[in-house]
């Protein structure tokens, strides 16, 4: 059963009317209602607030990494373990083909249903997850395979065990190693891009965000609690943090924004998956045609955080 957010109530009402028209066999009413639905969707989604975009990024029906992998990756083979400690189910690694292009895919997976969410640790990776991702990146480099990374996490797991096993070191090592990989790398934020937990698999030649995703150094709720000691200031924090694709593109922190279906990826995962596939293939061709892509990646990373101070 579809889940609707509060600002989608009118969409839900019209959708229910369409279903009733289908039951009655009233094609004329169905056609009228579908036109009304399209108009309502355009009206709502063209005027979303940043807080509503945050809600969409976290929508329970939003496609996760495994949804996209199942739809776009063929002849796939999953790889487990980090060769150091354990296998972290919050990060999934696959070898397969996207339109007959051999590729390594690394994704952060939140899981669906209570049992699977617990297995995936709600998409919050431990150090062994990031080390597994690095292992696969080195595999891709050895066999000259491009890498697609699907980012979707509230953040790296902050548990005591994770810290004892070197959470910060594992993330830092990934930043260092992914920056110098000798194969094309493409990272897409498909939902939440939370802090270092997201950044650990977001260092790439091309960094893109889905239209209704977010990328932030801390959750807006956490920011509000720290700065104002008031979690109700979340909407204020969102505006101050600039976490939406549009804001981050304007700041030069991401390369591209991937448009979603008219009702969002959570209403049409098949179209969203096809868009991701096409973006990956186009970006890969662009990178492969550039003999200086390694230098360009380095220069892009080195330019982050630079600023010019003017004296009046």
From Swiss-Prot:
Gene Ontology terms, MF aspect: acetyl-CoA carboxylase activity; ATP binding; carboxyl- or carbamoyltransferase activity
Pfam families: ACCA
Record keyword Nucleus present: no
EC number(s) on file: 2.1.3.15
Any one of the GO BP annotations: malonyl-CoA biosynthetic process
Entry annotated with the keyword Nucleotide-binding: yes
A single Gene Ontology CC term: acetyl-CoA carboxylase complex
The protein's name: Acetyl-coenzyme A carboxylase carboxyl transferase subunit alpha
Native organism: Helicobacter pylori (strain J99 / ATCC 700824)
């Amino acid at each position: 059963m579809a889940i609707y957010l509060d600002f989608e109530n009118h969409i839900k009402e019209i959708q229910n009317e369409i279903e009733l028209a289908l039951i009655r066999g009233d094609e004329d009413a169905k056609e009228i209602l579908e036109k009304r639905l399209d108009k309502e969707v355009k009206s709502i989604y063209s005027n979303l607030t940043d807080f509503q975009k945050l809600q969409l990024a976290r929508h329970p029906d939003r496609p996760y990494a495994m949804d996209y992998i199942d739809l776009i990756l063929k002849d796939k083979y999953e790889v487990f373990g980090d060769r150091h400690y354990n296998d972290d189910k919050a990060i999934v690694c696959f070898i397969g083909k996207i339109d007959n292009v051999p590729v390594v895919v690394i994704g952060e997976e939140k899981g669906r249903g209570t049992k699977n969410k617990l297995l995936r640790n709600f998409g919050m990776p431990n150090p062994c997850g990031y080390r597994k991702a690095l292992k696969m990146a080195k595999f891709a480099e050895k066999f000259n395979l491009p890498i697609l990374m699907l980012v979707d996490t509230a953040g790296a797991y902050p548990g005591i065990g994770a810290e004892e096993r070197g959470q910060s070191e594992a993330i830092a090592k990934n930043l260092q190693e992914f920056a110098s990989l000798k194969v094309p790398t493409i990272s897409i934020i498909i939902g939440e891009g939370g802090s270092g937990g997201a950044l650990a698999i977001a260092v790439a030649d091309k960094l893109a965000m889905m239209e209704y995703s977010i990328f932030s150094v801390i959750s807006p709720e956490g920011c509000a609690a720290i700065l104002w000691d008031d979690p109700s200031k979340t909407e204020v924090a969102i505006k101050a943090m600039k976490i939406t694709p549009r804001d981050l593109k304007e700041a030069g922190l991401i390369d591209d924004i991937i448009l979603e279906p008219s009702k969002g990826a959570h209403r049409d995962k098949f179209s969203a998956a096809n868009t991701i596939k096409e973006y990956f293939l186009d970006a890969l061709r662009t990178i492969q045609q550039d003999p200086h892509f390694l230098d360009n990646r380095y220069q892009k990373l080195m330019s982050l955080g630079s600023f010019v101070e003017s004296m009046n």
